[in-house]
């Protein structure tokens, strides 16, 4: 697929950056903001939507309730009754509020006079109460990008959701350790015009947040949501982009998806089709008997569980289900996503992809005959329990009919390959209502004074300071954008100048990336481990060269750090000199025959023996001494 002209199709992108704050307490109670795997009890809940003050039910909440899932909550030792929704929330945390105020000021946003907490209905189980508490801190503002001002719409404080442990068709298990951790949400205006600009703006906002020195790091602590639309399409919400580098691909693919859905709408009009024609000719036939001897593993597996096989006729839709919307995803995939989300069924096949999946040409012809499929028609085969098939057929018809309208209003989930899938309908205005258990909090002089310590430095000033520490411009830029910037500054204060800032920065960024490139599990390389190794270098317990070797072994084996370190005890000069003399003696004939390469030969062999136990500069010095 050729890339679209984004100015021509009217691409608009807005960002929602969600970042956990590194505070002592949660947003509405005094519990700590640390995560714990252990738990001492668990709760079980079922959640259901309720009518708003205007008598409306939010469509997204209704969608989640229809799944009928049970929610199980593990209660860790660092949790209280607030997280369990058995005690009213406490007043808003001052530290979190002060950080949000500081960020607001840095983004030229206008602070509200009083902070009012609202309830946002969420009944996917991620909140025990059935809603998420959120509060607007400031309005308006901007961030610069290549001379253009990207508007800020709102900056809000909200509580993070419970941490999902497992998800099955009937229940979801959550841990309450994450529920209530303060989260700052920065929403930009839809001023972003290209996929690459979106990545730059997200990077700059993330950088600004890190420069406060009060945000959490690691997987799941920051999340980018995207709002994407093109001319003729609709604003689509894309949730849960974890990696910045995925942002351009996700936007490109969403723009393409909306563009292709609009093309499908045009194609259906060219075919003189309309909703009434498709609806009136829509046919459902039970094909279970016809597939009783099939070789399709998917269908046979369902038949063994007493499932049924339905065939659906869709008039005039030949070629539509196979229409590619983005890489590896077609219109048929979109329909299947709706069925999976609403009916919990995964076995859907359409005529544009058959014969395939063990379904033979003869079986396809049999289905065409039974459903009375004409040359321009299409059909779908769906398998599952009868009670779910009834929901699935209604879902399929609804999604097919929406093709005549173009792009549906959806919330979609970001996938690791840069594509997206249907998640749920977009929530409506019936989702929000006031929190009656928390009094308003005025942004007074005390909060403004507290916020001063968190106002982030300008990136240009911070970059200059990093270069003044001796870092190259490239390494300084890498460190400026690093999630470990605050750790770097802490280690420099403790261990430089004996351990150079350049070595510390290289270890935190370049060495860790090297370990990852070698297949290492870098999740085991914690801040504590990195500091411990820098401290060992400072105390001359290991050499600088040993750090990379130790981290690589730690990330590629199950060996404990203290066991690995034992193998890298530094050699003293006498021991090192002995090894060098022995190596020269062992390779005497070779270096006599290759005098011009003698140094390289001995250097290679010595380093193989002493790697990680001796400083390479010292090795070079002693080899030169003994080679003459």
Curated annotation (Swiss-Prot):
SMART domains: GatB_Yqey. GO terms for biological process: glutaminyl-tRNAGln biosynthesis via transamidation; translation. Belongs to the GatB/GatE family. GatE subfamily. Its EC number is 6.3.5.-. Pfam families: GAD (PF02938), GatB_N (PF02934), GatB_Yqey (PF02637). Allows the formation of correctly charged Gln-tRNA(Gln) through the transamidation of misacylated Glu-tRNA(Gln) in organisms which lack glutaminyl-tRNA synthetase. The reaction takes place in the presence of glutamine and ATP through an activated gamma-phospho-Glu-tRNA(Gln). The GatDE system is specific for glutamate and does not act on aspartate. GO terms for cellular component: cytoplasm. Transmembrane segments: none annotated. This is Glutamyl-tRNA(Gln) amidotransferase subunit E. The keyword Calcium does not apply. Heterodimer of GatD and GatE. PANTHER family: GLUTAMYL-TRNA GLN AMIDOTRANSFERASE SUBUNIT B MITOCHONDRIAL AND PROKARYOTIC PET112-RELATED, GLUTAMYL-TRNA(GLN) AMIDOTRANSFERASE SUBUNIT E. The lineage of its organism: Archaea, Thermoproteota, Thermoprotei, Sulfolobales, Sulfolobaceae. InterPro entries: Asn/Gln-tRNA_amidoTrfase_suB/E, Asn/Gln-tRNA_Trfase_suB/E_cat, Asn/Gln_amidotransferase, Asn/Gln_tRNA_amidoTrase-B-like, GAD-like_sf, GAD_dom, GatB_C_1, GatB_Yqey_C_2. It comes from the Archaea. It is an enzyme of class 6 (ligase). The keyword Cytoplasm does not apply. GO terms for molecular function: aminoacyl-tRNA ligase activity; ATP binding; glutaminyl-tRNA synthase (glutamine-hydrolyzing) activity. It catalyses: L-glutamyl-tRNA(Gln) + L-glutamine + ATP + H2O = L-glutaminyl-tRNA(Gln) + L-glutamate + ADP + phosphate + H(+).
